[in-house]
Amino acid sequence: MAKIVVVGANHAGTACINTILDNYEGNEVVAFDANSNISFLGCGMALWIGKQISGPDGLFYQTKEQFEAKGATVHMETPVEKIDFDNKVVYATGKDGTKYEESYDKLVLSTGSLPIIPRFEGGDLENIQQVKLFQDAQEVIDKLEDASIKRVAVVGAGYIGVELAEAFKRNGRETLLVDMAPTCMANNFDPEFSEMMAKNLADNGIECHFGEGVDHFEGKDGKVTTLVTNKGSYQVDMICVCIGFRPNNALFADGQLDLFANGAVLVDHHQKTSRDDVYAVGDCSTIFNNSLGGDPGYIALASNAVRSGIVAGHNICGTEIENPGVQGASGICIFDLKMVSCGLTENAAKRFGVDVLTTSVTDTQKAGFIEHDNPDATIKIVYDKKTRAILGAQIASTYDMSGTIHMFSLAVQKGVTIDELKLLDIFFLPHFNAPYNYITVAALKAE
């Protein structure tokens, strides 16, 4: 049996610890985390800010006490300051000043990611916020109790930025959404889908400023008052910056581990790093992108983090399983418009030099004679021109089509071709779908 030290009790770390404790007896598990809480579901922050849920209690699914009841030792508010990989020792200091020198047989790095915060002039003004941790969301909500905060700008129109824009609008604030890209969610969807969301945002009263880069912030009496871009100045009372995340790699950025181009730890299919007995999971590590032939990449999603933690936990304890890679399956629901995607978009394929074809269709999910709860759905499938393997899909509707993307995720993982999809066995019942399902119709239209 082994002594296993886990640095970071976030989603990936939590999944790893639970996998070890629930399936293998006799191991000593010691965890360190710099935060005061475990397992906060950051995806729920926008719902909380937007008053779509009553509070944050349901956004936690694991506690220190639950870990300890299973036999783990957990040190909260105890950041790890140094790791001696040669001698297998972790050094940390608790909030009360207690020093820890913890030896290990196996080490799991689960340090997560950090928000990318550009150094804008005026960036230290009050009411310029970031949203990553529970404490960040609580601070925003507390500040929104101040009725003088009437106008909020969100910088960054990816998933999180779009969700926050909706949240601030639902909270009763005038809301601006700013991004230097020509539209929103450009990394997840092709323009025709992104424009659906952009129109949806505008129709719901959000002031969109795409194609504008932030230049600096201005303030008065220490508080932000103005957002200045390359195209204009906008009066604001709060700014939320959410332009992306980077691996939290301060503990291993000194060349002791092999790293990816963006600083994430390179891992193999067992979550092993370049050092013996050291594993990395979650946002601090790479994934294998099946839509790009299984090459290493970086996709910071909680779902990826959990899977990587499970894989590492089993391999550490002697059960050899491989991470099958990911397709980046994701989704978003804003003002009732639901959009899901996985794999490559057409634009992404062009960036990566992949020669692709696409097929698209807009149709109802159910039979056309169903008069209620049967809105249009738009689907786009991206497939390899030569091999005809499906590489990605995007779907948008006010109807919940999210389950369909799971099928496409598996199709990308398994190399299913567009031609195989044409005759997929999809049942027909008017309550559920049409005789020619929109998926089948799109496949049949493929060149």
Walk through the language-model features, giving the residues of each.
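Beta1-alpha1 glycine-rich phosphate/pyrophosphate-binding loop at the start
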Residues: A2-T73, A165-F189
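Flexible, glycine-rich terminal cap/loop adjacent to redox cofactors
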Residues: V7-H11, T19-G26, A34, I243, ...
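A Rossmann-like FAD-binding core segment of flavoenzymes
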Residues: G26-E28, E68-K95, E101-E102, R170-V267
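Rossmann-like dinucleotide-binding cores of NAD(P)H-dependent redox enzymes
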Residues: L59-F60, R151-A153, Y159-E218, I299-N304, ...
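Short hydrophobic core segments
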Residues: E102-G112, V236-G244, G309, R388
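Glycine-rich dinucleotide-binding loop and its adjacent helix/turn
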Residues: L109-N171, E207, A261, V267-H269
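FAD-site-proximal beta/loop scaffold in flavoenzymes
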Residues: D124-S148, D221-T226, S233-V311, A411
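A conserved FAD-binding loop/helix module that cradles the flavin
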Residues: V281-T345, F432-E447
